[in-house]
């Protein structure tokens, strides 16, 4: 069927900020969809609140709105733009929920706007637990016994009838938010109460647990002519009971017989046809390992995380084709862009194995609840491709960047058998490593299967890896053993460990015997047809399919999996860098391991290598491609950490040189550089042991900020007030050593701001200064940032610009640089310099209109700012006010304290822009879901050192109609100063303590601060987690509360008696 002519203007709804459960895969999907619709001649309007995305670049759609994804704002944009249709299926759960809200509010009917892709009835049938159950019964598809409940009592009655364990699934939530497996009535009551609150329709499904079944997923496509096909089937390593986003996944399925595969395939196609979905859809099924019995678990009537994985695993561009299907094109008339000859109706065939392993944030959150269940906890994922399962699994392990080069954690060799068995049974994020350790200790795979319900096939593969390790131990320097290990994915580093040699020795041995990897193409058709895609993975076989180009090439290193501190912002910079390389006439090669991102879309670069970002894997690509040089500036700390070893191997690092990168990262060299440049910094010293650290702190004076050197996202950073705390920090948080010194700095409690600069070595362009709303002590990634600055004098801005210029030129910076400053008593100090692209690049690029990563790349390739038409110094400021606000995923991470501090905790960001600070702040708070009612009750529980400041805030809250409540000490202080506050009870005082008041809806906001010492006070943590669980706005920094107050005051009318 030809594309529709009756619609011209289509609105695409984005997925908003990155949170756990909804990450970069939607930037990838949305970007593909917008470009596909433009390609077909439609006018595309995009709405999204996340500035860190490629999708929100001006050239992706005809009009781009970076506005809050709330009914209020989306309605305004719709009324202004009057689109003919809306495509909501590429914006994740956010997009679907927005479509439902627009429909319920009558806006779609009122303006005669059509929904494309998935009809409302299908969204309802797939998402509303009752309707889904009815549909499955009509289709004769088995689902676990279940009931829909709207109260806790209904849940208890049902569970008593069918027996425990049961699973709770709240309706219309994302990534299993609020759900869980319950083994007792007590757990059921707690989880259901929470789930009902988090479900927008106050509805939960309670179902019989089928934990232990195999979990299988089918990614299916259908068009308006009812053509349907399976793009990819995937099998979870972990059985049902662990959210698929937290499971290790293999594609294609590994343990299904033909009969089982056909049975589940038929079920999936039957479901997508019944739902009449036009586009992509994901079906999750549970299969009994011992019979042909299966159950349908759920259906996502949209592009999802699994579709991004399926797209990258097969090369089949699901989102692009889904967008075209939505406007009437059919699968049998669209060409598959990979082969350029076959049609999209052709089901992909794979002659390789793909492994996906999730990346969890527990290296940042040591106290987080690590046990996995039906609620997702991973922030990102890695994917690896190999010719056998062992190879793809080991490549994925070393892609994770968690300090392992194999499926082995050396620290586990010391744990007791008892602890090992517990960890194998109770699945945590690192269960794979415990299983492998158990096999190394001689546990049989049959024993492990009965404990974990993981299929024997997978456990046998882990056993095979251990057998190869043993073979290597017995045959040191043996060429055949080396070849076998390489064929099954072993890294040079692991083989070197076993043979007690250096990694370079193994590399030399391989080269002397011409043992190199070859690169195979991902072609969707198992090499049956010629493919045109330059998309490759390495393996140790005979035939190489990747040929070095005759054009000069540049290799750009990506940033690996998304984790806290290194998010989609770095992928944004990578993609822009590639565009600039191509414009300059070079061939652009990307190397990355993250399946969710735009950079790993094969159409972005001239060549894509889907490989781990390790020295060995990068060198193998360099040996084959012989690029002119490598760019490491845009891949976050991942790429920067590879610079030294690549340079030592004779590779040309383009842009800022390795010794200059080192001067910015190495404490003593940096201090020396600042002294020479005449730039003040907080007093500080490096310490390699406890004694030195105590000596340094004594000299500098408490409080001090302590942290390890060479980290990203403020990992293991703390503010300490006395000797005891410093000793405690050194013993528990870091292992200080001469190789890994710790930094001890004077802690300056002042205003923070940061600058991104672009330098060609002679002149320096400063696109803008961002002022942080929260004072020093809160990580820059967790602060709200304002551009242009609202409270910095002209003189301070000039000083900042001057220091930035001196630094860029003094450190021989070519390309990007980020500098952070703290200002106290009109004195400007430099806190740190990062000689690379930072997480503020997308935001600043959007608000200034300067394509920063592209300009930086042009300078790296030899042009000057003058050539590009840019002046030296601070760029003219925008007339609008722009706010970048952090977004957190605390609802997904039990036992992670939401208190803000020097260690980064946010997973994403939103942006608010308007003509005044108050309006921009209002938009930023709305966009990150911190909606505060205009009156109500607010609780203050404040540390002694900030009570005076909190008092003035409390008075202002009272003036606009809030009732002030406070804990004992705070209430007493307020009373002394003449402000009466309602006293709340101590924790445990059942009727009147804060968690109880919050649970019963009596509290609209909480302001809770702790002293500099920031001790893990149990009461404070209970208060904070109750606010997070119940969705009550929580302010742990007074500056944020003050910003919110500014918004409320601006929306208030003055009401006075005459």
From Swiss-Prot:
Quaternary structure note: Composed of two chains; the small (or glutamine) chain promotes the hydrolysis of glutamine to ammonia, which is used by the large (or ammonia) chain to synthesize carbamoyl phosphate. Tetramer of heterodimers (alpha,beta)4.
Essential cofactor(s): Mg(2+); Mn(2+)
Pathway assigned to this chain's UniProt record: Amino-acid biosynthesis; L-arginine biosynthesis; carbamoyl phosphate from bicarbonate: step 1/1; Pyrimidine metabolism; UMP biosynthesis via de novo pathway; (S)-dihydroorotate from bicarbonate: step 1/3
Pfam families linked to this entry: CPSase_L_D2 (PF02786), CPSase_L_D3 (PF02787), MGS (PF02142)
Top-rank lineage group of the source organism: Bacteria
Bound cofactor: record note: Binds 4 Mg(2+) or Mn(2+) ions per subunit.
GO MF entries: ATP binding; carbamoyl-phosphate synthase (ammonia) activity; carbamoyl-phosphate synthase (glutamine-hydrolyzing) activity; metal ion binding
Known catalytic reactions: hydrogencarbonate + L-glutamine + 2 ATP + H2O = carbamoyl phosphate + L-glutamate + 2 ADP + phosphate + 2 H(+)
Entry binding sites for Mg(2+) 2: 298, 300
InterPro entries to which the protein is assigned, alphabetical: ATP-grasp (IPR011761), ATP_grasp_subdomain_1 (IPR013815), CarbamoylP_synth_lsu (IPR006275), CarbamoylP_synth_lsu_oligo (IPR005480), CarbamoylP_synth_lsu_oligo_sf (IPR036897), CbamoylP_synth_lsu-like_ATP-bd (IPR005479), CbamoylP_synth_lsu_CPSase_dom (IPR005483), MGS-like_dom (IPR011607)
Span list, region Carboxyphosphate synthetic domain: 1-401
Keyword Transport in annotation: no
One of the protein's GO biological processes: glutamine metabolic process
SMART domains recorded: CPSase_L_D3, GARS_A, MGS
ATP-grasp domain segment(s): 133-327, 671-861
Name of the molecule in the record: Carbamoyl phosphate synthase large chain
Residues holding Mg(2+) 3: 820, 832
Annotated positions binding Mn(2+) 4: 832, 834
Positions with a binding annotation for Mn(2+) 3: 820, 832
Residues holding Mg(2+) 1: 284, 298
Keywords: Amino-acid biosynthesis, Arginine biosynthesis, ATP-binding, Ligase, Magnesium, Manganese, Metal-binding, Nucleotide-binding, Pyrimidine biosynthesis, Repeat
Domain MGS-like: from-to ranges: 930-1058
Region (Carbamoyl phosphate synthetic domain): 547-929
EC number: 6.3.4.16, 6.3.5.5
Positions annotated to bind ATP 1: 129, 169, 175-176, 208, 210, 215, 241-243, 284, 298
